[in-house]
C-alpha cells in the first residue's frame, strides 16, 4: 500500500483525464461546450480542482530579441474539490465562454499560417502529479471580420502570415495581453505606394476596432515609413456596407498620413520583428505580463506545453 501511494505521488497509476469537445469550432463571443471525462487510478484520489483554459502561441519581444511563448489567456473552473474512487468513471459537462478578443485561427475553412489555439484541461490532484489534456480549437471570424477580409481579397491583397504580439495598442480598449496581426502582400494597384499591410481586429460585444499598419515605400528623395489608421465599426454594419469601397478608402486615407497613431511603449521604439521603422511596436504600450498580479491572462506556460503544440498550428 505504501508503495502504491508512492507511485501515485509520481503520477503512476493515478487518475486520467480526457476532454471531449462537442464541437472544436467556435467564434469570438460564443462558447466551447464539452465534457471532462475522468477515470480513477489504482488508488483513491483527492481532486482539488478541474479547470479548462484557452492557450495560444504569442510572440514576445524583449530588448533586441524576440521569442515565442505559449500563453494561457482565459481560464474557467469546471469543478471544485471531489473524491475519485479507484477506476471510477466521471463525466463533467462545461460551457466555456470565448472572449470577444480571441484571435481568429481559421478563415475560409483553412488554418491561418502562424496561428495555433488549444483548450487545456488541468486536473489538480492532492499529493500527486497534476494531470492535463490539450485539444485543438478552431476560432472562425465573425461576420464583420469576414466582410473586411473578403474586401482585402477582392482588392487583390494576398495573405502572408498571422501571429500574436504581446502588448497593448495605445488608445485601444483591450482585455487580452496580446493582439493579432494578419499580414498581407500589397495588391497590384497599391504596389507603388505600399509593400505590405498588417490588419488587427480588437473586437468587443458592440463592434470591432480595425487597426491598419501600412509599410509605405520610399521615394527617390524620401525614406520608407509606416503609416497607421484606426477605424471603429459596429457589428450591425456587417451586412449593409460596401466593404470593398470602405477598405479601399481606409487604405488610401491611411497611406496619406505619417505615423499619426504612433505612441511609444516602454523603452526605445523598436521595429516589428526588427525589420523596419518603428512599426506597430511603436504603437504598443508593451506592459510586462504579470504586472497585474494574479491575472490568468498573463500566465506563460511554454515549458509545460511546447511539446503538446507540435502537432497542430505552428509554422
Predicted regions and their residues:
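Short aromatic-acidic-glycine turn motif
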Residues: 55-68, 217-223
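A short beta-turn/strand-edge loop motif at beta-sheet boundaries
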Residues: 41-48
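A eukaryote-biased signal for short, well-structured alpha-helical docking elements
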Residues: 1-11
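A beta-strand/beta-hairpin structural motif
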Residues: 66-109, 129
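Short, low-complexity, glycine-enriched hydrophobic/amphipathic alpha-helices that associate
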Residues: 269-314
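Extended serine/threonine-enriched, polar tracts that run as long, contiguous segments within proteins
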Residues: 154-223
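Short beta-strand elements
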Residues: 75, 124-153
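Internal, hydrophobic beta-strand segments that form the core of beta-sheet-rich folds
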Residues: 53-57, 95-101, 109-128
Amino acid at each position: 500500500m505504501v508503495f502504491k501511494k508512492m507511485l501515485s505521488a509520481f503520477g503512476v497509476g493515478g487518475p486520467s483525464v480526457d476532454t471531449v469537445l462537442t464541437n472544436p469550432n467556435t467564434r469570438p463571443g460564443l462558447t466551447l461546450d464539452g465534457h471532462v471525462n475522468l477515470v480513477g487510478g489504482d488508488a483513491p484520489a483527492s481532486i482539488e480542482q478541474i479547470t479548462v483554459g484557452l492557450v495560444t502561441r504569442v510572440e514576445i519581444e524583449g530588448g533586441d530579441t524576440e521569442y515565442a511563448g505559449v500563453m494561457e489567456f482565459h481560464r474557467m473552473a469546471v469543478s471544485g474539490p471531489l473524491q475519485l474512487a479507484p477506476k471510477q468513471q466521471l463525466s463533467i459537462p462545461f460551457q466555456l465562454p470565448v472572449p470577444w478578443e480571441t484571435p481568429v485561427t481559421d478563415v475560409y475553412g483553412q488554418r491561418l499560417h502562424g496561428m495555433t489555439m488549444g483548450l487545456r484541461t488541468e486536473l489538480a490532484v492532492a499529493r500527486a502529479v497534476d494531470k492535463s489534456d490539450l485539444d485543438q480549437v478552431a476560432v472562425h471570424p465573425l461576420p464583420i471580420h469576414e466582410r473586411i477580409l473578403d474586401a482585402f481579397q477582392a482588392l487583390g491583397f494576398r495573405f502572408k502570415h498571422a501571429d500574436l504580439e504581446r502588448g497593448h495598442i495605445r488608445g485601444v480598449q483591450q482585455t487580452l495581453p496580446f493582439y493579432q496581426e494578419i499580414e498581407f502582400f500589397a495588391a497590384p494597384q497599391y504596389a507603388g505606394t505600399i509593400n505590405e499591410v498588417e490588419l488587427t481586429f480588437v473586437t468587443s460585444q458592440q463592434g470591432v476596432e480595425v487597426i491598419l499598419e501600412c509599410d509605405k515605400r520610399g521615394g527617390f528623395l524620401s525614406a520608407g515609413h509606416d503609416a497607421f489608421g484606426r477605424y471603429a465599426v459596429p457589428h450591425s454594419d456587417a451586412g449593409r456596407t460596401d466593404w470593398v469601397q470602405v477598405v479601399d478608402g481606409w487604405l488610401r486615407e491611411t497611406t496619406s498620413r505619417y505615423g499619426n497613431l504612433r505612441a511609444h511603449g516602454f523603452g526605445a521604439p523598436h521595429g516589428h520583428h526588427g525589420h523596419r521603422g518603428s512599426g506597430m511596436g511603436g504603437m504598443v504600450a508593451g506592459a510586462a505580463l504579470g504586472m497585474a498580479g494574479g491575472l490568468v491572462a498573463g500566465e506563460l506556460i511554454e515549458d509545460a506545453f511546447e511539446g503538446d503544440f507540435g502537432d497542430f498550428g505552428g509554422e
